[in-house]
Amino acid sequence: QLEVYARVLIRFVHAVMMCRSDVEAFTLGTRLTRITRELSARNPDSALSRAANAVEDWSGGTRLGEGIKEFNDQWGIRGMARGATVLILSDGWDRGDSETVSEQMERLHRVTHRIVWANPLKATPNYEPLAKGMAAALPHIDNFVEGNSFNSLKDLSKLLTE
């Protein structure tokens, strides 16, 4: 589902990284991949190409709980997530265990300043967060926003600067 939006969302993250030096970027499919270095290229096409080459599980489905656990264990809890605004760009579809998603989102939420989740599907008329990963994550999210258009990304940019 997110495939349609993935390139635009990664370009958005690249643009944010070009404006701020304290941004880290990861992709989460069936595994967690840090792409901060790849997205540091000034040229957006080069950055996107480098990121795509670094991600082995592009379009391979999503295991949100396991990936968020890996982030928490390796990067987040004792490091970069502490006191940070964490932005998750996802449709919430998950191939893993929803209980793990809930547990790991709760764990992440305890150490962050806030969690912002941008879901491209949220703009769909009559959308309800019924995907099991999205439903499990929702109680631990501070801002649940759309992520499907230029205007929604502009609004997201404003939200991130608050």
Question: Where do the language-model regions lie?
Answer:
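Von Willebrand factor
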Residues: 1-84, 86-87, 126-129
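Extended hydrophobic-aromatic, low-complexity segments
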Residues: 5, 18, 25, 36-37, ...
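Active-site proximal loops enriched in glycine and acidic residues that flank catalytic Cys/His/Asp
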Residues: 6, 27-30, 88-92, 97, ...
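A short acidic, amphipathic alpha-helical/loop segment
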Residues: 8, 12, 100-107, 133
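Short glycine-/polar-rich loops that comprise or flank the Walker A/P-loop
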Residues: 19-23, 83-84, 111-114, 140-141
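Exposed acidic/Ser/Thr-rich ligand/metal-binding surfaces
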Residues: 65-111, 145, 155, 159-162
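Von Willebrand factor type A / integrin I
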Residues: 105-162
